[in-house]
Amino acid sequence: MFKPHVTVACVVHAEGKFLVVEETINGKALWNQPAGHLEADETLVEAAARELWEETGISAQPQHFIRMHQWIAPDKTPFLRFLFAIELEQICPTQPHDSDIDCCRWVSAEEILQASNLRSPLVAESIRCYQSGQRYPLEMIGDFNWPFTKGVI
């Protein structure tokens, strides 16, 4: 049975810069957007806000849905990655709460698009989607019978 990993990611933008998180994987420092897996007891928007806080210490809510990417990683792991936009008025300090995150950096779009240390090609693709102006209302992602507590009828 096909069971893709459901993940969320945040393109965080302030004052012309984008926020990336840096983590060391197999001895290499890699950049990613604040991102992670959906948990069973949360909506996609809640997951995005949680991952942002865990990985950067920033408490903010996504303002827009950008895109859903269906992707097969090089190790053949399937993903459905839901991408959200978060616009901040100004660059703010970061304090990761997730021990897997080494640091956070505010960088330009060009630095991301030209970087050789991206965790996946989706990091650059997410910036391209953001730059293209793709934005959809959060209501596009509906919660049905949420929270799910009554069982199947």
UniProtKB/Swiss-Prot annotation:
Class of the enzyme per the UniProt entry, highest EC level: hydrolase
CDD domains, per database record: NUDIX_Hydrolase
Required cofactor names: Mg(2+)
Alphabetically ordered keywords of this record: Hydrolase, Magnesium
UniProt short sequence motif Nudix box, positions renumbered to this chain: 36-57
Signal peptide: none
InterPro entries with a match to the protein in the record: Nudix_hydrolase (IPR020476), NUDIX_hydrolase-like_dom_sf (IPR015797), NUDIX_hydrolase_CS (IPR020084), NUDIX_hydrolase_dom (IPR000086), NudJ (IPR033713)
EC number assigned by the record: 3.6.1.-
Domain Nudix hydrolase: 3-131
Subunit structure and binding partners: Monomer.
Assigned protein family: Belongs to the Nudix hydrolase family. NudJ subfamily.
Protein name, per record: Phosphatase NudJ
Lineage summary: Bacteria, Pseudomonadati, Pseudomonadota, Gammaproteobacteria, Enterobacterales
